[in-house]
């Protein structure tokens, strides 16, 4: 049955309630105390339509943006060190920078492209001869080598994740560091010692790959890794060395504090009109609402909360209570049926949300339905469109991952965010959207929330995506899935599995009849992987005696590899070994995506060793009983995480929620250990994704016994399988970001 995408009957599915807040309190007087502003308070960027007042420091760093997912983090790292930075498009010439004046150095970002592509972006070669110090990162490093006479080669084995490299500490960039450093590598193209540009020397190595080159006389430095992210342990020190020892900056850049900048922007955009803000109850939308109230007063801000049918257990009730602290009336609407029945056009015609199994289409339907529902609510509240702006708590990572022009005209799309869909972008073009946090990262928003006086319960709340549980349910039809792989490790279409990972590291027997190693023999692949490991991991791999089983799951998840989006398979590891060999399992999780380019996520399956391959999936769509199943599992897992319930043996569980930054709970259409005589798959599995990060651009999967108590996770496994009907297995996501994103979709 065809269903109209404009079916938004407010009487069909909506329950409108208004939380009448107490009389608004007088906001404290706004003050700007530059003497007490910390380093992270400095704030400058060249983003379209962002009127931020700048105070010139007399020294600036130019960042040439090649579309790196971490491009904005580079800008942030420089600002944290009190040096002014400005972002420019990749085609900016050296002459332009010289004529603008005031630039003391240049940083070239990474990017999603390969230097081998026919139309791969390049830069003005005079960037390297203009006399300014240059730091090239990832793709910028490869261009530095190529444009100075070296070459770059395409590798069979990717490097994606935290790796140990050896560095020359006599080089200015690495002064004060250890000879072995942990860094984030994410690339498939490489430079070897034989292909380094003339007059450049190797200053860092990762196995047999070159991880850094330099010409100190010309003050040119290039690194294959990403020093701007948290996974590079001493990346800030590297930026400090470049800015102060190489470039000669003083670090005297100060500007208005964040709060004042945001308030100034809100007032300049809104003028004497009003704002409608959609509030989810998360920290981003709460801080956005608090800023709007501070800038405009409560009478010019209308806050609404939309229950789209995919909230967590009793989430909307909790939102109403927590947002009362903002002294804003909250208008609550329930639109579950409307969202489920909303449709969008795709290549196969029109698809409804509750019949959709494509993750990108799900996000687009939800994002666009939010905008259409907003119009219905404005009519219900007698709001004049011409008198109101739409406000969103959009963050910088949202825009970067959606490849929005606000963040970078060249960033590769990782996933479409519900607050950055086509309709939202159209409203931006009309100047009708206010996004005061669009230049902020999550940790910066928390700091701003504290400055605004928001309660700890809101400021430290774990993030929850706007589309809700809809993107934590991986949907599937009952059509038999086909495993599809590309690359030198595979020969055409592969319907198979990894059978064993045993005594030798990754010495697995993958169905030889499929001819997987026609282009690359296993032993060569294994040796290449071992070369990329640290000495500790190599010893662990070669000495282990555990029996571990590995199975490819016929489902795809979103990831980021080489600064670009990946949509690849997950691998499930299992073992009979007790205690569970976590160190070894996490070593596998790091290496498997390097060996198998078609894999971007690795999970551990609690319980016994998996015996059978997964040959079909459970029919799964966004219908009420499926959503309820995930709501129950999520509620159980979070109660255990925050110590709200006792363990199965009656002992009190500790509150360990503060030890991680987020824990998505995901439902998979996968039925493990199914009776082979059963006609079809009917159960689901649950994934726990505890995640440790400071900026959500990169991060580490929480390790049992290190970040979280093992007994907490084991208790989650027991409680979910006991109390939620139709659950086959509970899995632990062991994947860092990259190669896996925080969310699975």
From Swiss-Prot:
The active site is at 138 (for gatase activity), 226, 228. ATP binds at residues 280-286. GO terms for biological process: GMP biosynthetic process. SUPFAM superfamilies: Adenine nucleotide alpha hydrolases-like (SSF52402), Class I glutamine amidotransferase-like (SSF52317), GMP synthetase C-terminal dimerisation domain (SSF54810). Substrate binds at residues 363, 563, 662, 737, 743. GO terms for molecular function: ATP binding; GMP synthase activity. Residues 253-461 form the GMPS ATP-PPase domain. Pathway: Purine metabolism; GMP biosynthesis; GMP from XMP (L-Gln route): step 1/1. PANTHER family: GMP SYNTHASE [GLUTAMINE-HYDROLYZING], GMP SYNTHASE-RELATED. Homodimer. This is Probable GMP synthase [glutamine-hydrolyzing].
